[in-house]
Amino acid sequence: MPELPEVETTVRGLRPPLEGRRLTRVETRRADLRRPFPADLRQRMTGATITGLGRRAKYGLIETDRGDVMVFHLGMSGRWRIDPSEIGAHDHLVLETDEGRTLSLCDPRRFGSVDLVRGEELAGFGPFKALGPEPLGPDLTGAHLAGALEGRVAPIKAMLLDQRIVAGLGNIYVCEALHMTGIAPTTMAGRIAKKRLDRLVDSIREVLAAAIEAGGSTLRDYARPDGELGYFAKQWRVYGREGEPCHCGTVIRRRVDGGRSTFYCPKCQK
């Protein structure tokens, strides 16, 4: 599933062809999606000018001069394509601009979603109501984590994946940040000292910034809007590296909890 760096990279890639441009055509191409498109999407978006693009957690935001915000989630396999050579069966949404550019939202597994929300109602949009602070913003601090995790007996990894505590983190980058900080993923969250949480916040930011710089991590379907892959997988410290040596020489291990793989070094992470 695309995580924060992949969504941020996608948003940045969509800005050049979309920002400041008027949509001359909006076509929804499938009615049997898991989450159907809003019935009035074409009516409200056709003719609108895109005034800005942003991100909240793992959601992309496309703002218009009409006060609407198109909120998209890439699901498991979604990605945007700029000027595709052809529109395929998995291109479920197609946008055309007054500059003659074509953008398509391709989602083979159909777990993604598109919603249309009034800008003034965005904070109350269902998935956004209980989101925690953005990990790259000023509100995520060691003090915030200390307060949110106080008394919690759940593993730190599970807590970091809870979007109510930190918005946008996913499996890859939590594994990487915990390894960088030297915290075992099974450590009970409420027992971690404030100083270690301060370092954890720094590690989260460092990992995410590096991933965005590399264009995210391509696993199967993800690619940037221009078709380029994400190359952060070449920098993974532990994720996806079961049986390979950590930088300390210890063999990296994998455990499975709730169907999700966790990668860690038993020596470096305590």
Curated annotation (Swiss-Prot):
Keyword annotations: DNA damage, DNA repair, DNA-binding, Glycosidase, Hydrolase, Lyase, Metal-binding, Multifunctional enzyme, Zinc, Zinc-finger
Catalytic residues, chain numbering: 2 (schiff-base intermediate with dna), 3 (proton donor), 58 (proton donor), 260 (proton donor)
Catalytic activity: Hydrolysis of DNA containing ring-opened 7-methylguanine residues, releasing 2,6-diamino-4-hydroxy-5-(N-methyl)formamidopyrimidine; 2'-deoxyribonucleotide-(2'-deoxyribose 5'-phosphate)-2'-deoxyribonucleotide-DNA = a 3'-end 2'-deoxyribonucleotide-(2,3-dehydro-2,3-deoxyribose 5'-phosphate)-DNA + a 5'-end 5'-phospho-2'-deoxyribonucleoside-DNA + H(+)
Names of the cofactor(s): Zn(2+)
MF-aspect GO terms: 8-oxo-7,8-dihydroguanine DNA N-glycosylase activity; class I DNA-(apurinic or apyrimidinic site) endonuclease activity; damaged DNA binding; zinc ion binding
Cofactor, free-text remark: Binds 1 zinc ion per subunit.
EC number(s) recorded for this UniProt protein: 3.2.2.23, 4.2.99.18
Tree of life domain: Bacteria
Family, per entry: Belongs to the FPG family.
Subunit details: Monomer.
Name of the protein: Formamidopyrimidine-DNA glycosylase
Organism of origin: Rhizorhabdus wittichii (strain DSM 6014 / CCUG 31198 / JCM 15750 / NBRC 105917 / EY 4224 / RW1)
